[in-house]
Amino acid sequence: MRTLKSLVIVSAALLPFSATAFAADAIQEQPPVPAPVEVAPQYSWAGGYTGLYLGYGWNKAKTSTVGSIKPDDWKAGAFAGWNFQKDQIVYGVEGDAGYSWAKKSKDGLEVKQGFEGSLRARVGYDLNPVMPYLTAGIAGSQIKLNNGLDGESKFRVGWTAGAGLEAKLTDNILGRVEYRYTQYSNKNYDLAGTTVRNKLDTQDIRVGIGYKF
């Protein structure tokens, strides 16, 4: 009887410690609460933008009197456009206007380029934070021929096409590099009674910086 009484007393004394240990185990066995996952905001190319460009042009002017002349030089200007976006496809319209310092003479005939501009469609693929794209449209440029006796300047219209890569530098600042090929139609120039037929092709590499609204 005394043994049974002793067991009851010992069990009663250990009961609080057992309950505490069980409660501690229950608390420890609860699964940890997963930390919230932060989702980065999706960048959109949609909207308007504008910027400046600097480039270099490799030109080839074919003439009916002295053959080919290659007036290569720097160019600079501004561009602006508007993008639309559906999933990863980016499309829109862009225009640019600038000035080319290309000028060269051969056998007394000088070819000089001046104002140039274009209006183009553009389509790209969003690889956030960069976008490769293709572009094509119409182009125009002021081109002057001079043979030392007479000079004539004409505004020429042609077509242009190219490809580029645009990158998001910040939420609003864009950087780009672009290649363009442009061909201007044949034109006749009347230089002191001599008719000179001219065709001009240009190849440009341009780098630009822009601001997205």
Swiss-Prot record:
InterPro entries: OMP-like, OMP/PagP_b-brl, OMP_b-brl. GO terms for cellular component: cell outer membrane. It is found in: Cell outer membrane. It holds the Pfam family OMP_b-brl. Keywords: Cell outer membrane, Membrane, Signal, Transmembrane, Transmembrane beta strand. Residues 1-23 form the signal peptide. Its main location: membrane. Disulfide bonds: none annotated. Belongs to the Omp25/RopB family. This is 25 kDa outer-membrane immunogenic protein. It comes from Brucella canis.
